[in-house]
Structures are given as C-alpha cells and as structure tokens.
Amino acid sequence: MKRTVLLLLIAIAHLPALATTHVADTLTIALVGDIMMGTTFPSVMLPPNKGRDLFRDAKDILRRADLALGNLEGTLCDGGRSTKGNGPNSYSFRTPTSYVHLLRDAGFDYLSMANNHANDFGPEGIASTEHCLDSMGIKYSGIAGRVESVVIRRHGLRIGICAFGHNSYTLKHTDLTLVGRIVDKLVKETDLVIVSFHGGAEGRTRNHLPQGSETFLGENRGSLRQLAHFCIDHGADVVYGHGPHVARAIEVYKGRFIAYSLGNFCTPYNVSLTGISGYAPLVEIQTDRKGRFLGGQIHSMAQERGQGPRLDKAHRAAQEIKALSEADVPRSEARITPTGALRATLSFQGENE
C-alpha cells in the first residue's frame, strides 16, 4: 500500500504544470515609430558596419520589454521594380533582406506593414518582406487579403495585435466597420488588444493633433482622434500611431494608452531628420493584465543622417510630446514629466478584477 501511494505521489509530481501557468500582473510594452534601415533604390544608401550599430542605444530597452512593436516603413527585398517609378524623388524603400536579422537582434516582436511604403516593390516586395520576418519569428499584419491580425502569448496572456493604414492595399482605418470587426474579434479571443495605425498628414508643421479628418496629397489620412477612441470603445487596450514623421500627443483615455504618432525611429536615409523630425521617441509602458495603463517612460532619442536612434540627455522628444499632449489632449488621464516619466492620474481601485 505504501509503495502504491509513493508511486502515485511521484507520478503526480511529474505531471505537466498546466494548471499552474503564471499569469502576469503587469505587462511591459515598448513602442516605436517608423523603421527604414537603409535602401538600395534608386541608389545605395546603407549605414556603416552593415547596420550593426543602428539600434545600439535602444537594444536594452527593446529586449527587456515583454513586447516590442514598431512600423516597418518599406520592404525587405533584393530586387524588383518600383511601383513609384525610377526618378530620384520616387521615395521607394528597398532594404536588403540580410538586414532582417538586425530587427530580431534589436528585440522586435511585431512590426506593422500597414503603411504607404509596404507596396513600393509590389506583391513580390510584400512577399519577400513577409518571408524575411517569418524567418526571424517576427509577427506582422496590416496588408489587405493577407495577415489580418496576430496573437502573441506572454506570461499566460494572449495579446492580439492588428494594424491599419490609409492605402488601398492596407486594412484601411477610414473603414470603421472593418476596424470594429477586427478589434471586436480580437477582444473576444484574447486577453489584451493592441492596435497600430499609420495615418495623418506629414511634416514638421503637422505635429499637432487636429479635430476631424486630415487630408494630405489629396488623400484622406483619417480622423485619428476618432479612430483611437473608437478602438478603445470597442475594447482595445493600447493604440499607437505613426505616419506624420513627427511625434504627436500621448493620451490616456478610459484608462487606456494612446500614442497619436511616434514619428521616425530608425530612418537614417531619405527621410528628413531636421529639427523635430529627428526626434526618435521610444515609449515604454506598463499595463495591468486587463490592459489598463499603469505608467511608463518616454526614452528620448534623436537621429542624424546615417545613424540610428541615439539617447538624448536633453530629453527633447519627451518635452515635445509633453507640450503637445498638454495642448491637444488636456483631459488625458496621464501626466508627463520633463524627463519623460508617464504617470496615470486615475486609480482603478474598486474596479472588478
């Protein structure tokens, strides 16, 4: 009898610990804007040392996060014909496929493809980019008719991620019926939902968040305030944007985090880096397991031509975002210090856990 009990206890001790899977109380998420590491079109403009130093100052922050997300502005491919012509101002971005390992080494887990450069080299360029990201285990979404959304598991939590753009080949954020359908599906199937969008007018004079829709180059670039609130009203927990090539306001709405634009992050060539366009914020936030914003940090970085983001001890990106947030979203449920600390102004005590 004793031997039977002993054998039973040994067997129980070796059972898989499925029932005791730890669910994290908090989640750390790192968010950045546009990434275009270099291009071979129309001429070769690539960083020194094969790009190994591009993310030097950002790696530790990106790697320590539970999730690191950004926007891949362009393609990863080694050939093909530009869909925008061959002129010097075509602005088609073709990064060598070998550079994909730099993204994995930097710590990225997810990259949006829903932007106006994903189709620079047509369907072949999109397929090559997807193949490269797949080879590194980096998730992606945002192209219509391809990957609509992804789910990443971290610490017992299922995190759903989707991305929207303003071009015809992307999942369009101006189609709120589409946005609502995708977000609703993720809310039902996952524990926490992150939405990425590429939108808004571009340039140094477009850093303020307007009311209503934005038009740029004759194209509807979306009503981004409405879009972000719509996503959160439908159950999303984190919404982050890019597209204007400058940083914009940060808001906490109904306890959920919104970054309206994180500007340029790693764009050493063919993108203006003058003045505020050179600010490269890396935003690190913490949420609870329900997706509610707890706090965070804007890590101020800056770019110069030919190099990636470098830490900026003057905290210029944080101070720019602080000023924009106070002007454009004064009712935000978060405050930003001059050195970039993000602090929630509301407590969730008493809410159902």
Where is each model-derived feature located?
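C-terminal segment of classical bacterial N-terminal signal peptides
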Residues: 13-19
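Sec-dependent N-terminal signal peptides
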Residues: 4-13
